[in-house]
Design a protein with these regions (language model features):
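Basic nucleic-acid-binding interfaces
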Residues: 1-19, 28-60
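Cytochrome P450 catalytic-core helices
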Residues: 22
Length: 60
């Protein structure tokens, strides 16, 4: 799954996004925060990174 697809998934779960530093977005959900890299549309995110972001946001 690339970062755009993962961002759409997170948005459906009620996550809001703010610009971060460089090519990153700050993801916020229920007072919890994580960082999502936006390093190009076709680049795949690792499963460990997606799992950590979901855990940080209380989705897992």
């Amino acid at each position: 799954m690339n970062s755009d697809q993962f961002r759409r998934y997170l948005a459906k779960q009620g996550t809001t996004f703010e610009p971060g530093k460089g090519g990153h977005l700050l993801c916020r959900r229920d007072g919890k925060t994580s960082v999502l890299p936006q390093h190009g549309g076709a680049k795949q995110l690792g499963t460990g990174l997606m799992r950590k972001i979901k855990k940080d946001l209380g989705l897992e």
